[in-house]
Curated annotation (Swiss-Prot):
Residues holding 8-oxoguanine: 24, 51, 62, 146, 172, 208, 212
Signal sequence residues: none
Enzyme Commission no: 3.2.2.-, 4.2.99.18
Molecular-function GO terms, alphabetical: class I DNA-(apurinic or apyrimidinic site) endonuclease activity; oxidized base lesion DNA N-glycosylase activity
Protein source organism: Pyrococcus horikoshii (strain ATCC 700860 / DSM 12428 / JCM 9974 / NBRC 100139 / OT-3)
Protein's name according to its UniProt entry: N-glycosylase/DNA lyase
Domain comment (free text): Contains two alpha-helical subdomains, with the 8-oxoguanine binding site located in a cleft at their interface. Contains a helix-hairpin-helix (HhH) structural motif and a Gly/Pro-rich sequence followed by a conserved Asp (HhH-GPD motif).
Disulfide links within the chain: none
A GO BP entry: base-excision repair
Length: 239
C-alpha cells in the first residue's frame, strides 16, 4: 500500500514538497540570497555532515544555521564552526567530534568549483562516493547520504535546475524514518525503503523528502488539491 501511495505522489509530488513544504529547503533558499554560490554549496555539505545528535528538531537546526551564516564572511569552515557549534541551540552534542569531521572534509570542499558542482549535480553518486572516501566511512551512513540530499537542494537553488536523485543512494536512517519503518516492517530501514523505491519508481532520497516533513508535522494545505488528497492519505498511514 505504501509503495502505491508513493508512486501516486511521484517525483514531481516529492519536488513540490521539497520546494514548498520542507523547511530545510526554505532555510537554504533564504541563506543563498546574496551569497557566493560555491561557498553556499560548501557550507551546506559541511552542515549536513554535522547534522546528527541534534538538541532540537531538524527544521529548527537548519533555520538556525541559515540565520547564523546569512551575510557572514567565512574565512574557513572549521573556524566558523568552532565559533558556531558551542553557541548553537539545536546542535550542542559531540562538538569536538563534529569539528574533527569538518576539519577532515574542508580540504575536499575547498576544491569545489562551479564546474565541479555542476558535474556532481549531473551524477550525485560521484559526490556520494567522494565524501565517504574522504571521511573513511560507510557510504550508506546516515549523514553521508543526507549530505548528498542537501547538496541536491543547494545545487538546485544555485543552478535553477531540477535533477532527480539517483536510485542507488539509500534513505538517511534518521529517528523519524527508523520509527516509521518499525511500524511497517521488521526489515532494516534502508533495505525496506530501497524496495519501496524500486516498486514506486521514486528514488529513496525523494521518498525521504515526502516522509520526513510529514512525520515532523508539516501542513499540506498549500499543496495543489490532487496532491493534497494523496498526501492526506499517506499521512493517515504514517502518523
Amino acid at each position: 500500500m505504501i509503495a502505491e501511495l508513493i508512486r501516486e505522489i511521484g517525483i514531481e509530488g516529492a519536488r513540490f514538497i521539497e520546494e514548498n513544504i520542507d523547511e530545510q529547503f526554505k532555510a537554504l533558499s533564504y541563506l543563498s540570497e546574496g551569497m557566493d554560490r560555491v561557498n553556499f554549496v560548501r557550507l551546506v555539505i559541511a552542515n549536513a555532515l554535522v547534522s546528527y545528535q541534534l538538541t532540537g528538531k531538524g527544521e529548527m537546526w537548519w533555520w538556525e544555521f541559515a540565520k547564523y551564516f546569512k551575510g557572514k564572511e567565512v574565512k574557513t569552515i572549521y573556524s566558523a564552526y568552532k565559533e558556531f557549534l558551542p553557541n548553537s541551540k539545536f546542535n550542542r552534542r559531540l562538538i569536538q567530534q563534529k569539528l574533527l569531521r569538518i576539519k577532515k572534509i574542508e580540504p575536499f570542499l575547498s576544491t569545489l568549483t562551479e564546474e565541479s558542482i555542476e558535474r556532481y549535480y549531473e551524477d550525485m553518486t560521484l559526490l556520494w562516493k567522494a565524501i565517504a572516501k574522504v571521511l573513511k566511512v560507510d557510504r550508506e551512513s546516515k549523514t553521508v547520504v543526507f549530505s548528498v540530499k542537501m547538496f541536491g537542494y543547494a545545487a538546485r537553488i544555485v543552478l535553477s535546475k531540477f535533477n532527480p536523485y539517483p536510485m542507488e543512494i539509500p534513505i538517511p536512517e534518521d529517528v523519524r524514518i527508523i520509527k516509521l519503518t518499525r511500524k511497517l516492517t521488521n526489515e532494516r530501514p534502508r533495505d525496506f525503503w530501497m524496495k519501496i523505491a524500486k516498486e514506486s519508481n521514486v528514488p529513496p532520497l525523494h521518498i525521504d523528502s515526502i516522509l520526513w516533513p510529514l512525520l515532523g508535522g508539516a501542513r499540506v494545505e498549500e499543496a495543489p488539491p490532487e496532491l493534497k488528497e494523496k498526501l492526506e492519505k499517506l499521512i493517515r498511514v504514517i502518523r
